[in-house]
Curated annotation (Swiss-Prot):
Residues 12-240, 266-506 form the ABC transporter domain. Gene3D superfamilies: P-loop containing nucleotide triphosphate hydrolases (3.40.50.300). GO terms for molecular function: ATP binding; ATP hydrolysis activity. CDD domains: ABC_Carb_Monos_I, ABC_Carb_Monos_II. It is a peripheral membrane protein. It holds the Pfam family ABC_tran. It is found in: Cell inner membrane. Coiled coil: none annotated. Keywords: ATP-binding, Cell inner membrane, Cell membrane, Membrane, Nucleotide-binding, Repeat, Translocase, Transport. This is Autoinducer 2 import ATP-binding protein LsrA.
Length: 527
């Protein structure tokens, strides 16, 4: 009788996992498998259930039904500590570091002594190409560097199952390449990786297997090579809206009491004029933005884009230079006064800086108005405002008093945009608006930003995704090491040129300025 070799069990097997929140079904009898040395990509629209499933596997949430097995052995009553002991580690989409502890303390936090090896930490940092100061507080890092620290925490734990939730959302292409090299090294050691991403080219580059979630279930699963990009997109968003916002959505979206009177809408005077501005992380910055223009701000992490945005909003002091908003010098104004004057900032980190996670949705959407009007709230008015933006932006939620933290990432981002719009901006600074947002919600946000510009709002658009910068901007300023390395517009505005300029090459190409630029045909150039 021939001898048969038993097939080893999967590294991870999830069977029949279901979950409800307040009677709402978010996971429907999910089956999910991860083999040793495999990258299993998980795709899905915002609210599809990806994060809930991963939190159950990581012991953060208990399932209502179903079984989790690791190497063929059932895992009962999982907690985060127990999951870590078993070798399961979740790197969250939003960094969850201890802001007051140093980078090194965060990486080594609660590590067993046999794993808290500083030499190993130094080698891993070298492999990732990280040049972080380990002594600085984690709260002082940019989001991309915080993400790398979170990844380091997982790598230091010798995890057998590494769950990466949007790990490259804030990373540069070079940082992404180094991370992927490190992942491939782990795969050779038999580590299994669950890779959650909305970047389909990355999934094709890295993942052996792909599963697509929709409405709490698995809509598609199989070898990545067997599916086209269109197959994956259709499985995620079979009824996704395509094209521009509908007329009714635009009607709901119209800014309340638009600050820009019709008589001034055609003014050639810039909405904002920045002259020789210097501050922490940048120097000698000069540019202007017209009404209705989308000005892209590109550069690698550390180029000074976020520092510039925070200085324009008044969160950081300027050392020299002037900022003129609608012919008023606001350089010395406090943030509250800049907000009242019409300068609104949508920050990069929506959870840490943009939204009050434990406050109700209705309160959040009017939060900037609260800043101007005091703490007295008007629940009926807040409810009406939230309903208006729900219709305009397709925000999905169960009830008005629902805490923000219960929303999916894409719906949180839409709520943050609604909050900024309710402040009635003249100038809207948008920092990484689609970080961690799915394909469908990303398209919604693009159309939304264009619709805002059509209402003669000036927009500064900051993004690490160079393709979306080219797609969205009328002009692009490229920053390198805290300075503007050049301005691009028209045919010169392409990913390759921007990338070279972001790394210090001088390729600035501009066309004669055409004044207000609110469409692709009216792209200004002078900075």
């Amino acid at each position: 009788m021939p001898h048969t070799v038993a097939t080893p069990p999967p590294l991870l097997q999830v069977r029949g996992i279901s979950k409800q929140f307040s009677g709402v079904v978010v996971l429907k009898s999910i089956d999910f498998t991860l083999q040793p040395g495999q990258v299993h990509a998980l795709l899905g629209g915002n609210g599809a259930g990806k994060s809930t499933l991963m939190k159950i596997i990581a012991g953060i949430l208990p399932p209502d039904t179903g079984v989790i097995e690791m190497n063929g052995q059932p895992c009962f009553n999982l907690t985060p500590a127990k999951a870590h002991q078993l070798g399961i580690y979740l790197v969250p989409q939003e960094p969850m570091l201890f802001a007051n502890l140093s980078v090194q303390e965060n990486i080594l936090f609660r590590l067993p002594k046999h794993q808290a090896d500083k030499k190993k930490m130094a080698q891993l940092l070298k492999n990732l190409g990280c040049h972080l100061d380990l002594s600085v507080s984690a709260g002082s890092l940019e989001v991309a560097d915080q993400q790398l620290v979170e990844i380091m925490r997982g790598l230091m734990r010798d995890s057998r199952i590494l769950i990466l939730d949007e790990p490259t959302a804030s990373l540069t292409p070079a940082e992404t390449h180094r991370l992927f090299s490190q992942i491939r090294m782990l795969l050779q050691q038999g580590v299994g990786v669950v890779f959650i991403s909305h970047k389909l080219p990355e999934i094709r580059q890295l993942a052996d297997w792909v599963s697509v979630m929709r409405d709490g279930g698995i809509a598609l699963s199989g070898s990545t090579a067997d599916f086209s990009t269109e197959d994956m997109i259709q499985a995620m968003t079979p009824e996704a809206q395509k094209g521009a916002l509908t007329d009714s959505q635009k009607l709901w979206l119209e800014l309340p009491g638009n600050r820009r009177a019709q008589s001034r809408a055609q003014s050639q005077q810039p909405v904002i004029h920045v002259h020789d501005l210097s501050g922490e992380g940048f120097a000698h910055i000069s540019f202007h933005v017209q009404a209705g223009e989308i000005l892209g701000l590109a550069g690698v992490v550390g180029a000074g884009r976020t520092e510039l945005a925070e200085t324009l909003y008044g969160l950081r002091p300027a050392s020299t230079g002037n900022v003129i908003l609608e012919e008023v010098n606001i350089t010395a104004m406090k943030t509250a006064n800049r907000l009242a004057a019409g300068l609104v900032y949508l920050p990069e980190d929506r959870q840490a800086s943009g939204l009050y996670l434990d406050a109700p949705l209705s309160w959040n959407v009017c939060a900037l108005a609260h800043d101007r009007q005091g703490l007295w709230t008007q629940p009926a008015q807040e409810a009406a405002v939230l309903e208006r933006y729900r219709r305009a932006l397709n925000i999905k939620f169960s009830h008005l008093e629902q805490p923000v933290r219960t929303l999916s990432g894409g719906n949180q981002q839409k709520l943050l945009i609604a909050k900024c719009l309710e402040a009635n901006p003249l100038l809207l600074i948008i920092d990484e608006p689609t970080r961690g947002v799915d394909v469908s919600a990303r398209s919604d946000i693009y159309q939304l930003i264009r619709s805002i510009a059509e209402q003669q709002v000036a927009i500064i658009f900051i993004s690490s995704d160079l393709e979306e910068v080219v797609q969205m901007a009328d002009r692009v300023l490229v920053m390198h090491q805290g300075e503007i390395n050049g301005a691009l517009s028209g045919a010169a505005m392409n990913v390759d040129t921007i990338m070279h300029m972001a790394f210090g090459e001088h390729r600035s190409v501009s066309e004669p300025q055409s004044g207000t630029a609110s469409s692709a045909e009216n792209k200004g150039t002078s900075c």
